[in-house]
């Protein structure tokens, strides 16, 4: 009896970061062909919002932006896959080829399982956090119980996280170490404009509203921080209206240092 061959499905993950699978790579390839996120979304069968969110997640996940949207990109303008994006596409293709070879070993009766294991791996776990931001540690201040970790996100944007001293030590946090900062969207407060005034939240990221999605009760706001980085907040619909939040409006994301979770690549 002829059996259907097994198909290799590759996905890449880093600690605490969302999974990047073949569907996201296909989206990047489609953007490269069409030059727009809207055209790519139609080709791969995604809604425009889903495709836009996927691009934002990818840009936040990697050190260099994978896609650059020209002015007006949110409403159908041009988009360009960067050299880093092209390198990811090419590298993913090479890994898929290696995975297919390893799969052939498995189908052949696992006569050399160690060979397959050298080709199959996972770069770790999933996360449900809406915001996963790649950062570099700039300073660590250790206390008796807690540690304050300062992080560089982009030029002009920095974060502060407060974690346990034990966690900071076990993770080997020191200046120059790369980490992922995870912040739940519901933990992010928003203030209209660039100066929120006196407030206890030490993390303040000012940007421009890139997208607003309204639900019956809550509203999702995506704030463009520049350099292809973004942060998402979920606030009440009433609050979004009161603040006058709409695409193109400046706003500031606010959140506590204790609400930042750190994960290692």
Curated annotation (Swiss-Prot):
Coiled coil: none annotated. It comes from the Bacteria. It holds the Pfam family HTH_1. GO terms for biological process: molybdate ion transport. One of its GO terms (molecular function) is DNA-binding transcription factor activity. PANTHER family: DNA-BINDING TRANSCRIPTIONAL DUAL REGULATOR MODE, TRANSCRIPTIONAL REGULATOR MODE. It comes from Rhodobacter capsulatus (Rhodopseudomonas capsulata). Belongs to the ModE family. Keywords: Molybdenum, Repeat, Transport. InterPro entries: Mo/tungstate-bd_C_term_dom, ModE, ModE-bd_N, Molybdate_resp_trans_reg, Mop_domain, Transp-assoc_OB_typ1, Tscrpt_reg_HTH_LysR, WH-like_DNA-bd_sf. This is Molybdenum-pterin-binding protein MopA. The keyword Transport applies. Residues 126-192, 198-264 form the Mop domain. The keyword Methyltransferase does not apply.
């Amino acid at each position: 009896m002829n059996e259907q061959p097994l198909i290799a499905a590759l996905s890449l993950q880093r600690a605490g970061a969302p999974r990047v699978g073949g569907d996201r790579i296909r989206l990047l390839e489609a953007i490269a062909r069409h030059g727009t996120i809207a055209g790519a979304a139609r080709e791969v069968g995604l809604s425009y919002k889903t495709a836009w969110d996927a691009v934002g997640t990818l840009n936040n996940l990697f050190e260099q932006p994978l896609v650059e949207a020209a002015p007006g990109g949110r409403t159908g303008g041009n988009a360009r896959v960067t050299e880093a994006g092209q390198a990811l596409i090419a590298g993913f293709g090479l890994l898929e080829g290696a995975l297919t070879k390893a799969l052939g070993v498995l189908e052949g009766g696992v006569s050399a399982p160690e060979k397959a294991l050298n080709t199959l791996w996972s770069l770790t776990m999933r996360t449900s956090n809406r915001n996963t931001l790649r950062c570099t540690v700039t300073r660590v201040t250790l206390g008796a119980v807690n540690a304050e970790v300062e992080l560089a996100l982009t030029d002009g944007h920095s974060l502060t996280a407060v974690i346990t001293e034990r966690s900071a030590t076990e993770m080997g946090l020191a200046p120059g170490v790369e980490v992922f900062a995870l912040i739940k969207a519901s933990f992010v407060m928003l203030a209209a404009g660039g100066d929120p005034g006196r407030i206890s939240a030490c993390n303040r990221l000012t940007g421009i509203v890139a997208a607003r999605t309204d639900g019956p009760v809550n509203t999702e706001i995506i704030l463009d921080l520049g350099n292809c980085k973004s942060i998402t907040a979920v606030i009440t619909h009433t609050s979004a209206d009161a603040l006058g939040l709409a695409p193109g409006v400046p706003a500031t994301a606010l959140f506590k240092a204790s609400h930042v979770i750190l994960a290692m690549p």
